[in-house]
Amino acid sequence: MTQAALAMSITATDPVDTATDARLKECIDSACQRVAPLWPLKHFVAVNPFLGFTGQSFAATAATFERVVRTRILMPRAFYRQALDDGRIDDAALARALDIHPSVGLGVEQLKQQARATAAPSSPPAVVATVAEVLDRLAEGDRYVSLVAFMIDEISAFCAGYFDEGQASWPSPVRSLKPYAAWRRLAAYDRNPEVMGLTGFRNAIAELPADPVQAIGLIITRLGIPERAVEDYLVRALFDIGGWSAYARYIGWSAERDGQRDDTLVELLAIRLAWGYALFQARTDAAFKIAWAQAMEEAAKLPDDQRLDDTPELAVDLVLHEAYEIAIRNQLIARLAGHGTGAAVARLPARPPVQAAFCIDVRSEIFRRALETAYPEAETIGFAGFFGFPIEYVPIGHTRGGAQCPVLLKPAFIVCEAVKDADDVEQAEVLGLRLLRRRAAKAWKSFKVSAVSSFSFVETAGLGFAAKIATDSAGVTRPVPSPVVDGLDPEIAARVMPRLAPGELGGRVTGFNDVQRVAMAEAALKAMSLTGPFARLVLLAGHGSTTVNNPHASGLDCGACGGHTGEANARVAAAVLNDPRVRDGLRAKGIDIPADCWFLGALHDTTTDAVTVFDEDDVPAALAQDLARLKARLADAARLARLERSALLGIPDKSAVDAAVIARSRDWSQVRPEWGLAGNCAFIAAPRSFTRGLDLGGRAFLHSYEAERDDGHRTLELIMTAPMVVANWINLQYFGSTVNNAAFGSGNKVLHNIVGQLGVLEGNAGDLRVGLPWQSVHDGTRLVHEPVRLNVFIAAPESAMDEIMQRQPGVRDLVVNGWVMLHSLGDHGTTIRRCVSPGVWIAA
């Protein structure tokens, strides 16, 4: 094709119908579904960054990201080469990986040669280019500010002001409008683009339709996007501003959970495309038109993502990654299959003195093992840390609270905070004082940061903060008060507890009635496989973390509690299960809790491994010695757990581990107060006897499950559709943040700046960052997290899991498309088989 013909092809391309074109709307909806949501910092939870791609295979997704998003979801070739050289990938793993990807057409030795060769830089055979990208290519080598970067900065600046949740001193004047309309209103006065050489920017935006969908359709037509490339072009545009797209998707996700519809992401897509359209209109030169026509011609020849031979370098890397995972999986399977269970079972009495239920979080695996060492007679249990109580917990002085349940669920009940043993007068006094202190703190902050008073404030009051800076630096005080106790006197904070009695708050019903309590208690106990015998003390230990100066602090708290600590859920569950009327109701349902059994709510601090037991004064006097023994054993277990974690934390002096770990939790310069869930690679749903005594290194989610107690496999279905999926989200967030932190992580923690109280920027500009900081997966010299997809092991009949996968297409997609590796555990874990697809199981 001649250059003239190429230039003319922009107008010759068949136009895509705009406002009434159902196909366009399908493309928009489909593109928006590709974006994974990003929860705000106040309840930051792990999300699978590939959530919108689980309907296709892992390999196809790798090809899609290279071709459409122009980024990788695998490690660099050098990583696999090093693993080969270190012996972490053996020939057997390579051969198995080649069997999975036969289209690569290589033998083991050929693959090793390819791995050790320097991969030639290559691009996929057909890509989806954007206007800004084409313009940047044309300007390569010039002293030139990237238009892609400029566009992202400008959109990010608008979003930061528009979505602000209270950080900005001056709220956006267009907040009342929808995003697209608000942006167009501001764009009419914005001269920044024209200063950058984008002539006619404001006119180009003004001529676009006011409706975002119509604007998208018009832009697609004017740009001449081939019909088969429309959806990919929209996906590419959304991933150009992936962080803000993810936050907009969160807004939509929240609306969908409440049965509503929200088009914030569509509006943001229109803004992004409008920028491209303005760039397109500003360039009328032949060089650009020819380059754009070539890009559209290439986009019209999009390949099938399944044809990995179109991208041979990617195919080699996929096989190498598969082999890397197989080698790690084989080691894990060998350890599980070779672990004896008889001795562990024999040590447990028929009625253990203590049963301690912990969250399935991988950090609990270390503590459970430590507690079983310190207290061999104790039985530990693994269950999602919300303990089956999906509540919205409303602190004193608030009208709304946080969702204390997995983000896949919607809170079913509202529980308000109250002061124990306080009458109505004292409750009102506490509420009024807290509100007064918060208003005063807000006014003081406004005075400190306002444009007029900030300079005089530093001059007159700066020295007064010297002592505070010193004590904060020494870890004696916190730079910012904990929101849990902010505005409360210490003696009042110690008396705060959840109020279970039915009530009303702002027109909403709060608390539980007796029928609801019995139903929730029954469901929780059955899901934990805890229906008897019951110990004298049953500990329900939620978990949270203690850090300072950490924007992602909630990401270290309990994901099953929606990015909050598990304290509220543990205390609510314990209070319900101690209720005599609830026990009467449970007895009628076949669950008999003895009179001498008491449930305790507790909180495991994953940063320090300290365990706090709540409501001790309610424990019957007859159990005082039992409680004292339990607390002593918990303290022993904490020391053992800290000692085990000290190596990874880089604490060389074993005699000073306790002090060093606690100091990290108070150090505002510490970028790695703990390792979170780094290293996670397995999810095991089985009786504890399958794994008791086995050191899994804090890498496995452990969920207690006894198939023989599960009538109709209802609990199994709950496990596979909720905890297993949440573990998959966590695993793939760590995976993405490791393989490509620039795209799926949040970069360097040291450079983070909070924006709008909802997320972080790396530096003072650029896109909103998603995922985990680099310091969460890397210790400065090596990776701490191994990028491995989740290996799931369930002690249940394969036929039952097959039926669940047939009923649950989302779970089936995860298994069949290789996002999790599902295995069955038979014969006490000595027989392990992997699921290829429902009904097809092979030897692992």
Swiss-Prot record:
Q: How does it sit in the membrane?
A: Peripheral membrane protein
**Which residues are noted in the entry as Zn(2+)-binding?**
359, 361, 543, 558
Localization of this protein: Cell inner membrane
The record's InterPro entries line, in alphabetical order, gives:
DabA (IPR018752)
- The answer on whether this UniProt entry bears the keyword Transmembrane reads no
Annotated Gene Ontology cellular component terms: plasma membrane
Record keywords: Cell inner membrane, Cell membrane, Membrane, Metal-binding, Transport, Zinc
What does this protein's UniProt record list under function? Part of an energy-coupled inorganic carbon pump.
Record-stated family: Belongs to the inorganic carbon transporter (TC 9.A.2) DabA family.
Q: What is this protein called?
A: Probable inorganic carbon transporter subunit DabA 1
Output the lineage of the source organism. Bacteria, Pseudomonadati, Pseudomonadota, Alphaproteobacteria, Hyphomicrobiales
Q: What gene name is listed for this protein?
A: dabA1
